[in-house]
A protein has these predicted regions:
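N-terminal DNA-binding recognition helix of tyrosine site-specific recombinases/integrases
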Residues: 30, 38-48, 63-65, 74-109, ...
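Basic, Lys/Arg- and aromatic-enriched nucleic-acid-binding interface segment
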Residues: 80, 84-86, 103, 108-158
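Conserved tyrosine-mediated DNA breakage-rejoining catalytic core shared by Y-recombinases
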Residues: 118-121, 125-127, 163-201
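Catalytic-site neighborhood detector that most strongly recognizes the C-terminal catalytic loop/helix
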Residues: 122, 183-187, 220, 268-293
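Short, basic (Lys/Arg/His-rich) helix/loop patches that form interaction surfaces
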Residues: 137-138, 207-213, 225-266
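C-terminal catalytic core of tyrosine-transesterase DNA break-rejoin enzymes
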Residues: 149, 153, 159-160, 246-271, ...
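C-terminal catalytic core of Y-nucleophile DNA break-rejoin enzymes
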Residues: 184-203, 208-229
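C-terminal secondary-structure termini that scaffold catalytic or DNA-interacting sites
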Residues: 294-304
Length: 304
């Protein structure tokens, strides 16, 4: 950042433009969109709270970020987790400005906040069967449902599916098909063997996407809109988005079936197993299975 970027909006705008140039290199498009959204809220906040279009970096105090945080949650009605992610972006830009010598101190350095840990949403085994077998009248809804199911049976997230090519589908020495790739988000390597259900979906839509892609992926908003209608038809009241498919694979199809966490971590393309532990939710079925195993091993040792 050059010396002339000494006001908050200018610095933030410059950083956001720089992110755009780095898309596909070391930053994702979703990161750029998030910073663009934060910039829009920041401009609105300055107008709302101070009747300003911009503010000098030297005039920033901790009270600024405190008021901005409250503004995001009250005026913008953002959930606590979303508001914290926006605060992360503002904090990052101000920290970079301080490190680059544009301000003598970081006024936000001591501001403490934490995002609440929200439970990961996933479909249970019963819900997954209902979701899979429910007859849908709309061809669009059926296609969007099948994309979601493919993600459920392979763990591949939306962006990785968007760029999934037929060249990534490789047979092993016994003829079983595998997907090999690197996650767009982290660069971490992942590898997943095809389940029969996923293979049927791949064959169903083979040749329908522009070469060399495996699927023609609609926008996430369009798929999620369809998922809301489908889950309602299936009698599922929870809010299900496309990313819930990845959670379903990890929790319902793997961890609930006794697959080791380290193995699931490799399939998900996580660089650290602590990331995978977020998915390790203990379900009632897992508890019941654990008690059954304890009972089997103890036999009648402690019977009255």
């Amino acid at each position: 950042m050059g010396e002339r970027y000494r006001t908050l909006v200018d610095v933030f705008e410059h950083y956001t433009n720089d992110l755009f140039k780095r898309i596909g290199v070391d930053r994702s498009e979703s990161t750029w969109w998030r910073y663009r959204a934060v910039l829009g809220h920041l401009r609105a906040f300055l107008k709302y709270e101070y009747n300003l279009h911009d503010i000098p970096l030297l005039e920033l105090e901790q009270s600024f970020i405190e008021q901005y945080h409250v503004y995001l949650k009250t005026v913008c009605h953002l959930k606590a987790g979303s508001a914290c992610r926006y605060i992360d972006c503002l904090n990052n830009v101000v920290r970079i400005s301080f490190n680059n010598g544009l301000m003598p101190r970081n006024p936000f350095a001591s501001y403490s906040y934490s995002a609440p840990k929200e439970p990961r949403t996933f479909l249970s085994e019963k819900e997954l069967r209902i979701f899979q077998t429910t007859r849908l009248k709309s061809a669009k809804h059926e296609y969007h449902r099948d994309l979601f199911l493919f993600s459920c049976f392979t763990e591949i997230c939306y962006k990785d599916m968007r760029y999934l090519t037929c060249e990534q589908i490789i047979p092993d020495t016994e003829g079983h098909l595998w997907i090999h790739g690197n996650r767009c988000k982290t660069g971490g390597e992942y590898m997943v063997k095809f389940l029969p259900a996923a293979l049927r979906l791949l064959e169903k839509y083979r040749g329908t996407a522009p070469s060399p892609l495996a699927f023609d992926m609609p926008k996430p908003s369009s798929i999620n809109c369809s998922l809301r209608r489908i889950t309602k038809q299936c009698g599922i009241s929870r809010h299900i988005t496309f990313h819930a498919a990845r959670h379903t694979f990890a929790t319902t199809l793997c961890l609930s079936q006794g697959i080791p966490l380290s193995t699931v971590s490799k399939m998900l393309g996580h660089k650290q197993i602590t990331t995978t532990q977020i998915y390790a939710q203990t379900t009632p079925i897992m508890i019941e299975d654990a008690i059954d195993r304890v009972e089997s091993r103890l036999g009648g040792k402690f019977a009255a």
